[in-house]
């Protein structure tokens, strides 16, 4: 009888040990500007004519399928060398509609993801969306908040702010996905967008005490620019006050010289993910661990005039069968 008891206890200890070994303590979230993920069909009321078969890019089914495959290759690789499950959610920009997202998630490597998307007001028809793994991130609510124009400027109106709230690792987490106006608009237009996001963040943090809030997107500004300071995104953790954010990308760009897009030989880091103060705790709960610009050789042009730049879908009007003019960014969270 004693022998059976000890055998049972030994087996039980093995099961417990195995469970402890497989317990997750690291999660990831990411952002990626997909650069013009258009299908080949005209959307009524949208200026998508360049991306039609008879448009300036001669956009056809072959090119569209190649684009989907390329995007899936990148998205399904994000953080996998660190977190086996991949990102719990991925904010994306420059997607035309729900149709392209449906097609993207039909790619075998992306089939475990779902998406949240609302049709926005952008005249070209490009929107933000959130891809999420329901096994990791349980969505509770979502909405798109439309942007108010800056001094009546509807030409440079931003795409709206996608807000999704849910549970990650058993904790309430909220994410705001952004795509702020391009550099074709002057700085005050992006400062205006930042002011609106800060107001949304303040409202959310007032409603949910100690909310773990993530703001991500293509801000079309660098971490040290005025718009990001208006948002309250700080370089050092010790500087972050209640209601503000930690911005790890400031150090990435300024101190390490690493960015997400190259313009005239200079790196910018427009694709940022910033974290509210409750995600900075040192010991308890879900908290910031480290960040990464996802830089792989296949994402970079290896020769020619634009050697060293992210390998785009097009160079001018020439189809390069590349990926995007931006590189993805990843945040790792420890539990």
Can you describe what each PLM-predicted range is?
Residues 1-24:
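Bacterial Sec-dependent N-terminal signal peptides
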Residues 19-110, 118-126, 195, 302-307, ...:
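N-terminal, active-site-proximal structural segment of metallo-dependent hydrolase catalytic domains
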Residues 89, 95-172, 180:
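Structured beta-strand-rich core segments of catalytic domains in phosphoester-bond hydrolases
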Residues 28-36, 141, 172-182:
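Active-site-proximal beta-strand elements of phosphoester/diester hydrolases
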Residues 35, 96, 181, 219-222, ...:
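Catalytic metal-binding/acid-base residues of hydrolase active sites
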Residues 36-43, 101, 184-185, 282-284, ...:
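Short, solvent-exposed loop/turn elements at domain surfaces
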Residues 20-21, 202-213, 221-335:
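Metal-dependent phosphoester-hydrolase catalytic domains
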């Amino acid at each position: 009888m004693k022998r059976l008891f000890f055998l049972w206890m030994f087996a039980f200890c093995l099961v417990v040990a195995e469970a402890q070994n497989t317990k997750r303590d690291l999660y990831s979230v990411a952002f990626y500007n997909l650069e013009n993920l258009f299908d080949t069909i005209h959307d009524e009321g949208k200026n998508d004519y360049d991306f039609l078969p008879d448009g300036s890019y001669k956009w056809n089914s072959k090119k569209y399928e190649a684009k989907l495959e390329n995007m899936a290759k990148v998205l399904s690789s994000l953080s996998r060398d660190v977190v086996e499950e991949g990102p719990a959610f991925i904010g994306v920009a420059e997607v035309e509609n729900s149709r392209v997202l449906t097609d993207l998630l039909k790619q075998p490597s992306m089939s475990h993801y779902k998406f949240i998307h609302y049709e926005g007001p952008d005249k070209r028809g490009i929107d933000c969306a959130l891809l999420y793994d329901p096994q990791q991130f349980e969505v509770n609510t979502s909405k798109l908040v439309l942007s108010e124009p800056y001094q009546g400027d509807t030409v440079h109106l931003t795409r709206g702010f996608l807000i999704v709230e849910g549970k990650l690792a058993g904790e309430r987490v909220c994410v705001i996905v952004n795509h702020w106006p391009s550099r074709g608009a002057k700085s005050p237009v992006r400062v205006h967008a930042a002011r609106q996001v800060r107001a949304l963040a303040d409202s959310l943090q007032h409603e949910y005490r100690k909310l773990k809030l993530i703001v991500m997107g293509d801000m079309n500004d660098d971490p040290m620019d005025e718009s990001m300071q208006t948002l309250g995104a700080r370089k050092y953790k010790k500087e972050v006050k209640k209601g503000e954010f930690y911005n790890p990308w400031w150090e990435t760009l300024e101190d390490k010289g690493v960015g997400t897009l190259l313009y005239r030989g200079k790196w910018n880091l427009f694709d940022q993910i910033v974290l509210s103060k409750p995600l900075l705790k040192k010991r308890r709960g879900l908290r910031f661990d480290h960040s990464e610009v996802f830089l792989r050789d296949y994402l970079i042009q290896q020769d020619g005039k634009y050697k060293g730049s992210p390998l785009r879908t097009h160079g001018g009007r020439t189809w390069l069968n590349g990926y995007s003019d931006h590189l993805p960014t990843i945040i790792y969270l420890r539990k």
